[in-house]
Swiss-Prot record:
Its cofactor is Mg(2+); Mn(2+). It comes from Chlorobaculum tepidum (strain ATCC 49652 / DSM 12025 / NBRC 103806 / TLS). This is 3-isopropylmalate dehydrogenase. Homodimer. Substrate binds at residues 96, 106, 134, 220. It is found in: Cytoplasm.
Amino acid sequence: MMYKIVSIPGDGIGPEVVAGALDVLNAVAKKHGFEVSVEEHLFGGASYDVHGSMLTDETLEACKNCDAVLLGAVGGYKWENLPHDKKPEAALLKIRKELGLFANLRPARVYDALVASSTLKTEVVQGTDFMVFRELTGGIYFGQPRGYDETRGWNTMVYERYEVERIARLAFEYAQKRGNAKVTSIDKANVLEVSQFWRNIVHEVHQDFPEIELVDMYVDNAAMQVVRNPKQFEVIVTSNLFGDILSDISGMITGSLGMLPSASIGSEHALYEPIHGSAPDIAGQNKANPIATIASVAMMFENSFNRPEVAADIYAAIEGALAAGFRTGDIAAAGEAISSTTEMTAAIVARI
């Protein structure tokens, strides 16, 4: 079995954390007896400096013709003053659109060794492990009309039936794989007609999955419940705006953005990346936490390659390294020894 992966390290700490993730990828390939082909391309500011474009046709074509894309990070101070449509973030939106990535998956998983790193009490967060499915291409971020003038501003939240159906179906299918995990659909159906539509469609899709429990929850209550009792959630499915906010709230339960992977999924393509930024202030200093990018590789094996046993090995190796006391600066408590990017990577590879 050969997996064809496109690596786009990007900017800032991106090349460092992607290098660590590829070390882990090679380790699991050797253990499980499959081959990987990794093709590297420039993206973001790194591409702009060489080609005058944040996303070249060559890079985009490579991403369309691989099994999965692994992204490091994009952006930085150097490119902040470029026109909006030339910035790295615009290139990220373009690649998501071109690849048809309609679902963003963000896990909220608290590792036992890092329970104390959360700002919440241990008894509240210990055992937390849920997945947020955020619709990525519809909703208020893309609806028309939109704009503002001197007296008012306006945006439009719109969802098509197919957009709600496909994200709901993806969430229910994932819940099946997790032993018929409970699905919580989050909306604002008490005041928004588009949320009433969302709820109706989710319930229609649920009829194909009668063995799965479905719970409806208003977004304001959900924000409170994620902090009050995060263990009640197993799978969350929600719209673009609500998912944008809730996934960040959920992520901080874990204690550091450096721990959090993500996946953007489409019908034919998928892109995996850490949720942290490019952190130009520590770039090139061997200080970055590679765990989010390494865990993104685990998500790749779960979702794109249907190899949960490979993903489980990666998660276990991460847990083992943390249990052994390895800590990068972002997750180290006062007085704890700080590991470099390469030291943390080596500790995880050794436990594959």
